[in-house]
């Protein structure tokens, strides 16, 4: 079963192209107009162990909100499509990621039900060119469109770059493991996801 998909989302504000192979080796190419976001996406997808290309164009140039949101939507839809009926996936996973003084907990359920709760206690307005409010918004857009339940929590840390990077790495690690094939059946007492 191929778990490869290509998705394109084009609006008056953005154009986002995603190529995603869930059973990859972490070969990633990211190009959006928000370099710090590119760095975070690259970390997430590398630790997810997928092969991915994400190309994002911001047609309006107002701020980073639209491109971050639309990448989350498109990548989430690509993950959902690549998972198919979710037969054989591990489904649940979690990760606790240290990055120097920062420590972040991530928990994932690839259930078909989209939800995200993010609490990183970020105080700065921006990290590089990424508005910190868009970190939680990206995770929400990703999770609701992928049909996953996602919880991201800061346990410790003061350096917000480290906190955000640990969060993206943790999401990648936990999501990659939860999407991995572990058997043949559907991991649900209901018999479907």
From Swiss-Prot:
PROSITE patterns: IGP_DEHYDRATASE_1, IGP_DEHYDRATASE_2. Its main location: cytoplasm. Its EC number is 4.2.1.19. Pfam families: IGPD. InterPro entries: IGPD_sf, ImidazoleglycerolP_deHydtase, ImidazoleglycerP_deHydtase_CS, Ribosomal_Su5_D2-typ_SF. GO terms for biological process: L-histidine biosynthetic process. It catalyses: D-erythro-1-(imidazol-4-yl)glycerol 3-phosphate = 3-(imidazol-4-yl)-2-oxopropyl phosphate + H2O. Keywords: Amino-acid biosynthesis, Cytoplasm, Histidine biosynthesis, Lyase. Signal peptide: none annotated. Transmembrane segments: none annotated. GO terms for molecular function: imidazoleglycerol-phosphate dehydratase activity. One of its GO terms (cellular component) is cytoplasm. Pathway: Amino-acid biosynthesis; L-histidine biosynthesis; L-histidine from 5-phospho-alpha-D-ribose 1-diphosphate: step 6/9. It is found in: Cytoplasm. Belongs to the imidazoleglycerol-phosphate dehydratase family. HAMAP family: HisB (MF_00076). This is Imidazoleglycerol-phosphate dehydratase. It comes from Metallosphaera sedula (strain ATCC 51363 / DSM 5348 / JCM 9185 / NBRC 15509 / TH2). The lineage of its organism: Archaea, Thermoproteota, Thermoprotei, Sulfolobales, Sulfolobaceae.
């Amino acid at each position: 079963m191929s778990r490869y998909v290509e998705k394109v989302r084009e609006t008056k504000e953005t154009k986002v192209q995603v190529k995603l192979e869930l059973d990859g080796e972490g070969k990633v190419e990211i190009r959006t107009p928000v370099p710090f976001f590119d760095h975070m996406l690259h970390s997430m997808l590398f630790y997810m162990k997928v092969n991915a290309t994400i190309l994002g164009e911001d047609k309006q140039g107002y701020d980073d909100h639209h491109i971050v949101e639309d990448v989350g939507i498109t990548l989430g839809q690509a993950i959902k499509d690549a998972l198919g009926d979710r037969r054989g996936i591990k489904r649940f996973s979690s990760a606790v990621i240290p990055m120097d003084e920062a420590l972040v907990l991530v928990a994932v359920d690839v259930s078909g039900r989209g939800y995200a709760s993010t609490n990183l206690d970020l105080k700065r307005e921006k990290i590089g060119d990424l508005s910190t409010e868009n970190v939680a918004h990206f995770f929400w857009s990703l999770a609701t469109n992928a049909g996953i339940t996602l919880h991201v929590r800061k346990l410790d840390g003061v350096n917000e770059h480290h906190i955000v990077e640990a969060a993206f790495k943790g999401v990648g690690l936990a999501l990659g493991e939860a999407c991995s094939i572990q058997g043949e059946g559907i991991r649900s007492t209901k018999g479907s996801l």
